[in-house]
Amino acid sequence: MNIWDIIVAIILGIVEGLTEYAPVSSTGHMIIVDDVWLKSKELLTPEAANTFKVVIQLGSILAVAFVFKDRILNLLGMKKNITEEQKSGNRLSIAQIAVGLVPAAVLGFLFEDYIDQYLFSVRTVAVGLIAGAVLMLAADWINRRKDTTDSVDRMTYKQALGMGLFQCLALWPGFSRSGSTISGGVILGLSHRAAADFTFIMAIPIMMGASLLSLIKNWAYLSADLLPFFIAGFISAFIVALFVVRFFLRLINKIKLVPFAIYRIVLGLLLFILFL
């Protein structure tokens, strides 16, 4: 392990932190990086590389949990009335989050082996990037024609279920969990900020659970000589994700989804040109 390896870990953590919660697909970007960098440089064994991805994803998840710490405490009954909506009697509930989680959890369980075997390639990521961009452009167009629910505390169970169904699209690498779910929320009548809030809150339990299970499963690959590599990636992913989530939430109602859609289309077309 040398200083260059640590720099690589930091760069990969930055990629994860930048893309995990922006609607551009962190999985897609990590597959691309894995294909054109990790595999070609042979920095890690395949098993250690997969464990590293889990570690940096955990860093980005903990960052969003930190951003929403007051909301999490509120959901657990440990903090009261953190928004004006809650003071008037409206409140996002754990039940709504559970309703949103069920569809993707069921489909992911049923088709996990198929997804792992057939959908994790640069070509499928390119398809997901472009298809997700089309969905995002459609969501912004629909959003211009209707009034929106501007607070996550006012969303309905129907909207929560609908966003959960849209989240199923993210099982295809490249679609993006946040891109699919925020687009779905906007189509269903939420403001961009309210849809983003629910998307991030809903992601915390399922991604935290999946990451911890994967980490336990791959614990043997956390060897002492790789520990500096893993720690560097974890810290960089946490710090970058912290800034990205806060920045994204401040701006999403103003910039909408179009800039992200344009980026996805350009990247998807570039991947088709380079890898087809």
Swiss-Prot record:
Keywords per UniProt: Antibiotic resistance, Cell membrane, Cell shape, Cell wall biogenesis/degradation, Hydrolase, Membrane, Peptidoglycan synthesis, Transmembrane, Transmembrane helix
EC number(s) recorded for this UniProt protein: 3.6.1.27
Catalytic activity: di-trans,octa-cis-undecaprenyl diphosphate + H2O = di-trans,octa-cis-undecaprenyl phosphate + phosphate + H(+)
Gene Ontology terms: biological process: cell wall organization; peptidoglycan biosynthetic process; regulation of cell shape; response to antibiotic
Database matches in InterPro entries: UppP
GO-annotated cellular components: plasma membrane
Function recorded in the entry: Catalyzes the dephosphorylation of undecaprenyl diphosphate (UPP). Confers resistance to bacitracin.
HAMAP family noted in UniProt: Undec_diphosphatase
Identification of the protein by name: Undecaprenyl-diphosphatase 2
Organism: Bacillus licheniformis (strain ATCC 14580 / DSM 13 / JCM 2505 / CCUG 7422 / NBRC 12200 / NCIMB 9375 / NCTC 10341 / NRRL NRS-1264 / Gibson 46)
